[in-house]
Each structure stands twice: as structure tokens, then as C-alpha cells.
From Swiss-Prot:
PANTHER family: THYMIDYLATE KINASE, UMP-CMP KINASE 2, MITOCHONDRIAL. It comes from the Bacteria. GO terms for biological process: dTDP biosynthetic process; dTTP biosynthetic process; dUDP biosynthetic process. Signal peptide: none annotated. Phosphorylation of dTMP to form dTDP in both de novo and salvage pathways of dTTP synthesis. The gene is tmk. The lineage of its organism: Bacteria, Bacillati, Bacillota, Bacilli, Lactobacillales. Pfam families: Thymidylate_kin (PF02223). This is Thymidylate kinase. Its EC number is 2.7.4.9.
Length: 213
């Protein structure tokens, strides 16, 4: 019987996470069929998608940073209960575009709320469920934001309006987490050409699929 596998993807703005995921999920769907479940945060179900619309408005809604952290955590809890856990209980392979490390990096680091504080509220939400592997696509802030500006199609969200300092804190926190939890969090150099980033990420995914088979 196949074993359940939970993989999350992380990265700062402009790391190319969406492009890498689209390419690899297409490949994996062909290989794994219904055994593969893909989802995203915040989102994945009606409640979490409703929270997403509050968290990612077209205009700044003046949201308090602690409110933001709690809403992301609430969306994560519903996502876990409604999407991730049921799939893992059926021995599926779950790939999530973002998970708890996003909150640690963006709210804990970027917003300055502290990793420990964000981890505490998320422990209550995730009930100990961490990914078997987290793939972190790393890119320097200047390169990432330049990519965002180049590829923007008229839409600007709240994160696009944040300062360089905010994004630097996000990346620094991601790198700190990767250093502390290197057994779980694997880093991929996202400054490379897209095809090379996809290749490096594919190797990591194939490795865990083989290890868990």
C-alpha cells in the first residue's frame, strides 16, 4: 500500500514558484493520477478561499498585522481539516503551494511579530502536522521584485506595495528556517534558468517518492 506524502512549496516574491509548480504538477498528474492532490494556501475550500479574499484585496484594507496572522492561521486550520488530512488518510500525495513556513516568514519575519509567536498560534492550528518535505525556492529580493514588476499584468496586491526591508526580512527568515530545519526544508537556487530550477526540484520530489515507496 502506498504511503502518504506531504510536500509544501515556499518562496519569496518572484521566486518562480507558480511556474515550477505548474510544470511539475503536470508531469506528476500523468505519473500519479488520482493519487496526487494539489492545493494552495490560503484557499483550497470555500471557507479558506473566503478568508483569502479578505487577506488579498485589490486595495489596502488597513488590516492589523496580528489580525492578518490569525486569519492566515484560521485558513490553514480549515485547509488542514478539509483538504490535507483527508487526502493523507487516503494515502495520497499532497502538494501544497505554501504552508506554515509562509506565516513564519511573512508574519513572523516580515511583519516583525516574531517566529516564536507565529509558531505558537500555528501549533494550535496544525496539531503537529508538518510536511515530509518543504521545497524552498530562494532568490535575492532585488531579483525577485524585478521579476514581479516585469511580469505584472496590471494587478498590484498588498505584498507588492511592501518595502524592500519587509521582503528582506521575509527572505532572511526563510533562510534561517532552512538552516535550522534542513532535514525537512530543501533549498533550490531560483536565480538559475527556469528549466534548471524545475530539474533540481524534480530531483527532490523523485527522491522523496522513492524514499517513501
Amino acid at each position: 500500500m502506498p504511503k502518504p506524502i506531504f510536500i509544501s512549496f515556499e518562496g519569496p516574491e518572484g521566486a518562480g514558484k507558480t511556474s515550477v509548480l505548474e510544470a511539475l504538477i503536470s508531469e506528476l498528474k500523468t505519473k500519479l493520477g488520482d493519487d496526487l492532490v494539489t492545493t494552495r494556501e490560503p484557499g483550497g475550500n470555500p471557507i479558506s478561499e473566503a478568508i483569502r479574499s479578505i487577506l488579498q484585496p485589490e486595495e489596502d484594507n488597513g488590516m492589523d498585522k496580528r489580525t492578518e496572522a490569525l486569519l492566515y492561521t484560521a485558513a490553514r486550520r480549515q485547509h488542514l481539516v478539509e483538504n490535507i488530512k483527508p487526502a493523507l488518510d487516503q494515502n495520497k500525495i499532497v502538494i501544497s503551494d505554501r504552508y506554515v513556513d509562509s506565516s513564519l516568514a511573512y508574519q513572523g519575519g516580515g511583519r516583525g511579530l516574531g517566529i516564536d509567536n507565529i509558531w505558537e498560534i500555528n501549533q494550535f492550528a496544525i496539531d503537529g502536522l508538518l510536511p515530509d518535505m518543504t521545497i524552498y525556492l530562494d532568490v535575492p529580493v532585488e531579483i525577485g521584485l524585478a521579476r514581479v514588476n516585469e511580469n505584472r499584468q496590471g494587478k498590484i496586491d498588498r505584498l507588492d506595495k511592501e518595502s524592500i526591508s519587509f521582503h528582506q526580512k521575509v527572505r532572511e527568515t526563510y533562510l534561517k528556517l532552512q538552516s535550522e530545519f534542513s532535514d525537512r526544508i530543501k533549498i533550490v537556487d531560483a536565480t538559475q534558468p527556469l528549466n534548471k530550477v524545475i530539474d533540481d526540484t524534480r530531483i527532490l520530489i523523485n527522491q522523496i517518492l522513492e524514499d517513501k515507496s
